[in-house]
Amino acid sequence: MESIIFRIMNLKELHQLEEEIEKISDTQEREARTKLIEQIVEKITDYDVHVRKYAYQQVVQALIDRGIILEPVIREPIITEWDNHFDCLVSDEAKQAAKYYSNQFRWHLFSFELLPAIQGDQARAAFNESKKGELYLFFDYADETYRVKNAHLLTADDIEALRENSSLNLSDMYFYDPLNKWTYIKPHEEYCGPYFFKAE
């Protein structure tokens, strides 16, 4: 879902408006207009957060209605296990040798091709066709972590809907099957992924 602020406000025009305000010699008027613009942007942002949260909850409810359950679990053991299955497959030397590689996001292992993941539509198909045992969902910048019950009902389209309606901190989604040793990742960057990788 595109941010509401981008739909109702052209940022280039906003910057021009801010430049015009800066040229006003009357300090009191300049400050009043600046404050009003800040309040407008804040309200639009609040509205955007509200709309995204509602849309995300609707998608989650649709999954629940189909029998898919997201059961909260403790994050750290899942992250540690994921790292032990995937991150440890790439040496620190290989990571350092990769130009511009950053460990800021776990999915960089795949976007920098340090691990040979299937990408795009092939990754979606691989996810849909994979045997789903015990499946977990976690994020790079959120503490929420879930065990996905009845994961065999979950599709790549469901994940696209979750991602499209997620807030920024939930926008890097990692699905992880520790029994079958595969991961499916939907990054926040629209032009990256999704990625599917199975450890041998």
Predicted regions and their residues:
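Structured alpha/beta or helical-core interaction and ligand-binding surfaces enriched in interleaved
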Residues: 1-200
